[in-house]
Amino acid sequence: MKMMDANEIISFIQNSEKKTPVKVYIKGDLKEVTFPETVQAFVNKKSGVLFGEWSEIKTILDENNKHIVDYVVENDRRNSAIPMLDLKGIKARIEPGAIIRDHVEIGDNAVIMMNATINIGAVIGEGTMIDMNAVLGGRATVGKNCHVGAGAVLAGVIEPPSAKPVIVEDDVVIGANVVVLEGVTVGKGAVVAAGAVVTEDVPPYTVVAGTPARVIKEIDEKTKAKTEIKQELRQLNPEK
């Protein structure tokens, strides 16, 4: 999986068309209303639903107010530069409420739990679980078979573009409410205890804890047993 360059992301945001998509429930004498091709109109003679850009739909509503009895607008963003990731082709388990922006890479059999937030350019390896309310900032990279605990934050780096992003190597367990700051690498097989604030690189196969996080021991059999990654949680239905 390839990490996006910060300048690529900046250019994408700069040059993207800023959009305010809306969903509008509409009621009235709709046979008298003409809808342009740029607006998706699922309507009958009396009612329906419109999908499109607010500026276009507002014009329709204003110009046809004598035919429209009532309408309700659903709107969740304004001048948004980055669309949400199209999830339909992703071979992972993604639960309701996860917010995943476009240009995120998600490996096979990964798990994204409710209300996780994953920003543009982030990379999630195969078999990795991102738990509830975790945040992966721009370009944060997590390897294979990891667990990022509930409420954890992996800081993002888009600006300044020269800054190094967070990198979490394979087989890492990050506890709940951990904060990993920009530029930190968490080495393969490491464990970060719940609530730690990680400001420096974590050596492979060590346990770190505290604020700021410090090495408290090397990984032993007891730690492995307590932080075991269960593949059963990552299984998907066979493809049909």
Swiss-Prot record:
<dbReference type="GO" id="GO:0019877">
    <property type="term" value="P:diaminopimelate biosynthetic process"/>
</dbReference>
<dbReference type="InterPro" id="IPR050179">
    <property type="entry name" value="Trans_hexapeptide_repeat"/>
</dbReference>
<dbReference type="GO" id="GO:0009089">
    <property type="term" value="P:lysine biosynthetic process via diaminopimelate"/>
</dbReference>
<dbReference type="InterPro" id="IPR018357">
    <property type="entry name" value="Hexapep_transf_CS"/>
</dbReference>
<keyword id="KW-0012">Acyltransferase</keyword>
<dbReference type="InterPro" id="IPR011004">
    <property type="entry name" value="Trimer_LpxA-like_sf"/>
</dbReference>
<dbReference type="Pfam" id="PF14602">
    <property type="entry name" value="Hexapep_2"/>
</dbReference>
<keyword id="KW-0677">Repeat</keyword>
<keyword id="KW-0028">Amino-acid biosynthesis</keyword>
<dbReference type="GO" id="GO:0047200">
    <property type="term" value="F:tetrahydrodipicolinate N-acetyltransferase activity"/>
</dbReference>
<keyword id="KW-0220">Diaminopimelate biosynthesis</keyword>
<keyword id="KW-0808">Transferase</keyword>
<dbReference type="Pfam" id="PF08503">
    <property type="entry name" value="DapH_N"/>
</dbReference>
<dbReference type="InterPro" id="IPR019873">
    <property type="entry name" value="DapH"/>
</dbReference>
<dbReference type="InterPro" id="IPR001451">
    <property type="entry name" value="Hexapep"/>
</dbReference>
<comment type="similarity">
    <text>Belongs to the transferase hexapeptide repeat family. DapH subfamily.</text>
</comment>
<keyword id="KW-0457">Lysine biosynthesis</keyword>
<comment type="function">
    <text>Catalyzes the transfer of an acetyl group from acetyl-CoA to tetrahydrodipicolinate.</text>
</comment>
<comment type="pathway">
    <text>Amino-acid biosynthesis; L-lysine biosynthesis via DAP pathway; LL-2,6-diaminopimelate from (S)-tetrahydrodipicolinate (acetylase route): step 1/3.</text>
</comment>
<protein>
    <recommendedName>
        <fullName>2,3,4,5-tetrahydropyridine-2,6-dicarboxylate N-acetyltransferase</fullName>
        <ecNumber>2.3.1.89</ecNumber>
    </recommendedName>
</protein>
<dbReference type="Pfam" id="PF00132">
    <property type="entry name" value="Hexapep"/>
</dbReference>
<dbReference type="InterPro" id="IPR013710">
    <property type="entry name" value="DapH_N"/>
</dbReference>
